[in-house]
Amino acid sequence: MSVVPVADVLQGRVAVDQEVTVRGWVRTRRDSKAGISFLAVYDGSCFDPVQAVINNSLPNYNEEVLHLTTGCSVVVTGKVVASPGQGQSFEIQATKVEVAGWVEDPDTYPMAAKRHSIEYLREVAHLRPRTNLIGAVARVRHTLAQALHRFFDEQGFFWVSTPLITASDTEGAGEMFRVSTLDLENLPRNDQGRVDFDKDFFGKESFLTVSGQLNGETYACALSKIYTFGPTFRAENSNTSRHLAEFWMLEPEVAFADLEDNARLAEAMLKYVFNAVLEERADDMKFFAERVDKDAIARLERFVSTDFAQVDYTDAVAILERCGKTFENPVFWGVDLSSEHERYLAEEHFKAPVVVKNYPKEIKAFYMRLNEDGKTVAAMDVLAPGIGEIIGGSQREERLDVLDARMAEMGLNKEDYWWYRDLRRYGTVPHSGFGLGFERLIAYVTGVQNVRDVIPFPRTPRNASF
């Protein structure tokens, strides 16, 4: 007898007539008049539960088995047999059922066997992984993360752990969470009456990172190809389906790479991870296509078989101005494209993923390489049909004098970035990279509309429960 995951039983990795033990939770119990009960037992290893067939001859049948309800945890031992019923190939003829844990009051159990609204599930985020939806999201999230690591490892990249606490604002937007151990009831003040951060833990103002990019660049300029993957934080007071205060970001950085290299890397990476999900999570993707977004599988299949289009920002604006469509947000050269503009380009004009590049410098970050025209920077956004922007990146400014001028234009103190500037003083090289919001990627793959439902415990304005 061996303990096996439910997935091994259902996917035929266990021989018929072999005795096994599965451990998990009851999804449903059905009793027949013939004195047989059918337990659907899941353990999270795959989408479907395994059916355990339990005869009333078991010694604890009346006292325990007949009282099992949704959510009870059980240890079931029995023989794997071919299932005569429709829906699954194998089931377990139980010879022993142990109850590991009861649900105290089945009538008040938040995850009782009925459909719950997605909004309700956010209120019980500690229990929602037990649902079909959130369980499937969690497995897809895992598969995407593993596929990203695999892709970069196979491409010769090194994973670099960049700090979560920083003194630098990568985006220059100032929407950062402050990290401090100062007594808020008795803040130290300097001669000017301002808070004296010299007395703080780090001896200066410190924040939660908005990006690992600047730190990542330092390692790319020594190891050639690196990526960072971890949590990032934005103190944006945005209550939308696309924003989180804490989210995960993947950021590769490559030395001796220009914007074209960057675009090729982004395309190869996305196609790799989408193929991985289609191959490795077929059961979960089938659920998403049936219950969440009927286009979920077909969208990914189209994506991996389609070449990316490319268009300059200037030409993209011209396309939008000439298209005859009325947008909520006006289109003109110099405007940051909104989601409706991005989706029109990807879904209606190009009908394919599209890389928009060479944006006006005024709407992009200080570290993006200034183009020869002096008006645009070597920035790119990857737009995907169905969602809009999914990746943002650029070739970085490797020329110290130009970088300093851009910082001055944007009102940044170059002394705060002394170490970043050093990269341009000691063996500078062209280099490029991009950022991928991991939760937006998961939302795109699954068809789940709100990023709050693809991260285990969402952090949003006025919400840091659990």
UniProtKB/Swiss-Prot annotation:
It holds the Pfam family tRNA_anti-codon. Its main location: cytoplasm. The keyword Ligase applies. One of its GO terms (biological process) is asparaginyl-tRNA aminoacylation. InterPro entries: Aa-tRNA-synt_II, aa-tRNA-synth_II, aa-tRNA-synth_II/BPL/LPL, Asn-tRNA-ligase, Asp/Asn-tRNA-synth_IIb, NA-bd_OB-fold, NA-bd_OB_tRNA. CDD domains: AsxRS_core, EcAsnRS_like_N. One of its GO terms (cellular component) is cytoplasm. GO terms for molecular function: asparagine-tRNA ligase activity; ATP binding; nucleic acid binding. Its EC number is 6.1.1.22. It is an enzyme of class 6 (ligase). It comes from the Bacteria. SUPFAM superfamilies: Class II aaRS and biotin synthetases, Nucleic acid-binding proteins. Gene3D superfamilies: Bira Bifunctional Protein, Domain 2 (3.30.930.10), Nucleic acid-binding proteins (2.40.50.140). Keywords: Aminoacyl-tRNA synthetase, ATP-binding, Cytoplasm, Ligase, Nucleotide-binding, Protein biosynthesis. It is found in: Cytoplasm. It catalyses: tRNA(Asn) + L-asparagine + ATP = L-asparaginyl-tRNA(Asn) + AMP + diphosphate + H(+). Belongs to the class-II aminoacyl-tRNA synthetase family. Homodimer. This is Asparagine--tRNA ligase.
